[in-house]
From Swiss-Prot:
Its main location: cytoplasm. It comes from Schizosaccharomyces pombe (strain 972 / ATCC 24843). The gene is alp14. GO terms for biological process: attachment of mitotic spindle microtubules to kinetochore; cell division; cytoplasmic microtubule organization; establishment or maintenance of microtubule cytoskeleton polarity; meiotic centromere clustering; microtubule nucleation by spindle pole body; microtubule polymerization; mitotic spindle assembly. Belongs to the TOG/XMAP215 family. Residues 526-551, 582-595 have a biased composition (Low complexity). Residues 239-253, 597-608 have a biased composition (Polar residues). Residues 262-274 have a biased composition (Acidic residues). Interacts with alp14. This is Spindle pole body component alp14. GO terms for molecular function: microtubule binding; microtubule plus end polymerase; microtubule plus-end binding. Residues 637-697 form a coiled coil. It is found in: Cytoplasm, Cytoskeleton, Microtubule organizing center, Spindle pole body; Chromosome, Centromere, Kinetochore. Keywords: Cell cycle, Cell division, Centromere, Chromosome, Coiled coil, Cytoplasm, Cytoskeleton, Kinetochore, Microtubule, Mitosis, Phosphoprotein, Repeat. InterPro entries: ARM-like, ARM-type_fold, TOG, XMAP215, XMAP215_CLASP_TOG.
Length: 809
């Protein structure tokens, strides 16, 4: 094997593999990038980070010397153009267009040429066509006729797809005459095709600009081509992103815009209005107090009759919220464990009635109810499955799928195929009935739960899982689900797509608030009436308006509504005054001048009364209510709201810090647990080593030899005369005879001779070689120490687990 085959290049960084000298390594890197781009959730995914920061890498990719690697590189660039953020795509546009026009469009491989043309069209879709055409035009004067012909063909395809309104024909027409004068026939052929495509969009004005520079033969040929064109006007088949209509709602993008008037006219559902108007009914006192006893009866008829009486009590349009935990526990137990299907059906109907009557107040019982209903969905009878499904839909309507997604997804791996099928069917119905888009976590949980079901051995499970994925794809978009479908084959993907095409969903993208809710300036604007004398008052702003000092009025200084004035910030209230004062009677004037003014222009009391009366009439004629009190209330409540917001933000920040500290503690405890496990395994290994050494110890082999030697010594001692005299002397007082007087030197066998035979007593003496064993095998002390350490480590691990549980809860 060669050195290249022996080395594992997959461990190298992606950036190193992209510029590697081995073309197979570059090929695998390009294919990996293409796959990661197509499976990305959005344009901000981590797979785009390298290319966004180093867009010059595309030059080496698109101009790869190996044709196979170049084809994979162009496919990766097409995926990048299709799935990346357009703002980052514009950075690589100039480099990529030059590389495509010089190397990719002239490639001997058809796949490379198709990818290059698709990349140019995607670059045009991202922003505009002018920068792309501007980068291609220098290639029209290249030395190689093949390069010129391929670039002219690319421009002709762009004009055919986007039209002359998007593709700037003024940049192209001046170069067409030079193309018709080229020596290569392929260049002239592509130039004719380009001219025909432009003529379809521009019409006869093209003749005035072009025919004066062409030969008569070329003009005649073009006239014949123009005559063969269809009479109907051409249609644009590809659009810029700014021209593309809003498609299906997506999780991250695509906000549906609606006018403000349209939003104001939309009315809520009639059922919600009727539910608000219905009076609440307290059903708990009407429940039979012996219900629990009746449901524990061994006769199924008693249980069924109890539920038959309970169902009308719970079938109320609106139920008053109360403590229903005991009742829900009784019903869920009947659903999950009762052997009679009639009792199960009635219990499911009772749960459904409670969910419809309590609505959002039933959400605290939703997880318990869904768990019991899904567990019982193993039944095969249609009436049972229908009752359970209706109850599950009613329960799910009281809560949100974001809260129950993990619980429902846990049943996707159940061994019973009926339960798995019911789980996927519940997902499909919930996706279809959702009125708002789910969170990313919910989408991820549901998709990962449904994908294995598509490959299940049971056909109804496969069909239900494919339907759930198809409806979810319709709800959140293809791109958000494609990343989960990569392990599936084409047959299963086509089945999911068939459900996707026929699925219907209720969820819509959220509307922009700026078009529905008026701004503060719009709220504070006053409506200017037709009668200039009557001043209308508008909504008082939240902030107080400080009146400016009064200035002298003049007829020439008329109020201009277009300019900023007091009406834009609040109502212009009249300022009461004791008497009208002329400009000359201000402070600082001399007393003589004031006397002259008084003498020349005496005050008219009638004019003063008339002015005061006019001011009163202005207030009386005003139909709008005086909002001064409301403005004061708003003024004093506003700081409270700010204070509450600040306290809420500070509490959230403190909770965030506590959460981070708990995470750090969990991390440290986890590391300690790992180290303790390693030490525990080492101690176990040492203990096993000591046990094996004990088995191979020489003491086990020496023990029989000691026994034989001790017995031999005993026999020699028993036959001696001194031993026999001792027996006769001490036999009345000591019936038991030992072979040794010293306790530490006794024989392992205590015996006595009777009729020439030895009899053994039940009380055995201590082994004479026990102390020798301790001296010979000291490893047992080490084993005891290791066992103590092992016990201590196990205790510490248990304490660590208890701390983990406490931190989690």
């Amino acid at each position: 094997m060669s050195q290249d085959q022996e080395e594992d290049y997959s461990k190298l960084p992606l950036e190193s593999r992209i510029v590697h000298k081995v073309w197979k390594v570059r090929l695998s890197a390009y294919e990996e990038c293409s796959k990661s781009f197509s499976l990305s959730a959005d344009g901000s995914d981590n797979c785009f980070e390298l290319w966004n920061n180093q867009s010059e890498l595309w030059k080496s990719v698109l101009t790869d010397s190996n044709v196979a690697a170049q084809e994979a590189g162009t496919a990766a660039f097409v995926a990048y153009c299709r799935f990346s953020d357009p703002s980052h795509l514009l950075k690589a546009r100039e480099i990529s267009v030059l590389s495509i026009s010089e190397k990719c469009l002239t490639s001997p491989r058809a796949g490379t040429r198709e990818n290059a043309l698709e990349a140019l069209m995607l670059l045009v879709e991202a922003d505009s066509a002018a920068p792309v055409i501007e980068s291609i035009i220098p290639s029209l004067s290249a030395r190689s006729p093949k390069v010129i012909a391929s670039n002219v063909a690319a421009i002709a395809s762009l004009v055919e797809q986007f039209g002359a309104k998007v593709i700037p024909s003024k940049m192209i027409i001046p170069h067409i005459s030079n193309l018709f004068g080229h020596a290569d026939k392929n260049v002239r052929k592509e130039a004719s095709r380009l001219t025909v495509n432009i003529y379809r969009w521009t019409g006869d004005p093209l003749k005035d600009l072009l025919f004066k520079d062409l030969r008569p033969v070329q003009t005649k040929e073009l006239e014949s081509l123009f005559a063969e064109l269809p009479t109907e006007p051409p249609k644009q088949t590809r659009f810029l992103k700014s021209q593309q209509p809003t498609s299906e709602p997506n999780v991250e993008t695509q906000v549906e815009e609606q006018p403000a008037l349209e939003n104001e006219e939309s009315e809520p559902e009639p059922s919600d209005d009727q539910f608000d108007l219905v009076e609440e009914v307290d059903v708990l006192p009407n429940v039979d107090p012996n219900l629990e006893t009746l449901m524990a009866s061994s006769k199924w008829k008693d249980r069924k009759e109890a539920l038959d009486k309970l169902l009308p009590v719970l079938s109320q349009p609106k139920i008053k919220d109360n403590d229903f935990f005991n009742l829900v526990a009784i019903l869920t137990k009947s659903v999950s464990k009762d052997a009679n299907i009639m009792v199960v059906i009635n219990a499911a109907h009772c749960i459904q009635a409670m969910a419809k009557g309590l609505r959002s107040n039933f959400s605290k019982y939703a997880s318990t109810s869904i768990n019991a209903l899904l567990e019982r969905s193993k039944e095969k009878k249609a009436n049972v499955i229908e009752s359970l499904s209706s109850a599950m839909d009613a329960v799910l309507a009281t809560s949100s799928l974001d809260d129950l997604a993990e619980l429902i997804a846990s049943f996707a791996g159940n061994k019973n195929p009926q339960i798995k099928s019911s789980c996927f069917s519940l997902f499909s119905r919930s996706f279809s009935n959702m009125t708002s888009l789910p969170s990313k976590f919910t989408v991820d949980t549901c998709a990962k739960a449904c994908v294995p079901g598509v490959s299940d051995t049971f056909e109804p499970v496969r069909s239900a899982a494919a339907e759930a994925l198809g409806v979810l794809m319709k709800l959140v978009g293809e791109r958000a689900i494609n990343q989960y479908l990569s392990p599936l084959d084409d047959i299963r993907k086509s089945k999911i797509r068939s459900f996707y095409e026929t699925a219907t969903v209720k969820a819509k993208a959220p509307t922009k608030k700026s078009k529905v809710k008026p701004s503060k300036q719009e709220e504070s604007k006053v409506v200017v009436p037709s009668n200039a004398k009557a001043v209308k008052k508008s909504v008082v702003p939240s902030s107080p308006v400080v009146p400016s000092p009064r200035k002298a009025t003049n007829k020439s200084l008329s109020m201009d509504v277009s300019k900023g004035n007091a009406f834009e910030n609040g109502p212009l209230l009249p300022r009461p005054t004791t008497r009208p004062v002329s400009r000359g009677l201000s402070r600082g004037t001399s007393s003589s001048l004031q006397q002259k003014v008084k003498a020349s222009t005496p005050l008219n009391s009638g004019a003063l009364n008339e002015t005061v009366q006019n001011l009163k009439n202005m207030e009386l004629d005003d139909p709008a209510p005086q909002p001064a009190k409301h403005s004061r209330v708003d003024r004093y409540e506003h700081p409270k709201v700010l204070e509450d917001n600040d306290s809420t933000i500070s509490s959230l920040e403190s909770l965030k810090r506590e959460n981070e500290e708990l995470r750090e503690q969990l991390k440290v405890e986890h590391e300690e647990n790992i180290s303790m496990q390693k030490q525990l395994s080492e101690l176990k290994g040492e203990l096993n080593t000591l046990r094996s050494a004990r088995k191979a110890s020489p003491i086990g082999d020496r023990k029989p030899a000691f026994m034989r030697r001790a017995n031999t010594d005993f026999l020699e001692l028993s036959t001696s005369p001194s031993f026999q005299r001792s027996v006769r002397e001490f036999e009345p007082t000591r019936p038991k005879l030992y072979s040794s007087i010293d306790v530490n030197q006794r024989s392992p066998l205590a015996s006595a001779k009777t009729n020439g035979n030895f009899t053994f007593h039940a009380e055995l003496p201590r082994s004479p070689f026990s102390s020798r064993a301790n001296n010979i095998n000291p490893d047992w002390t080490k084993a005891i120490d290791l066992a103590a350490k092992l016990k201590q480590k196990i205790t510490e691990m248990k304490q660590t687990d208890q701390r983990h549980q406490g931190l989690i809860h």
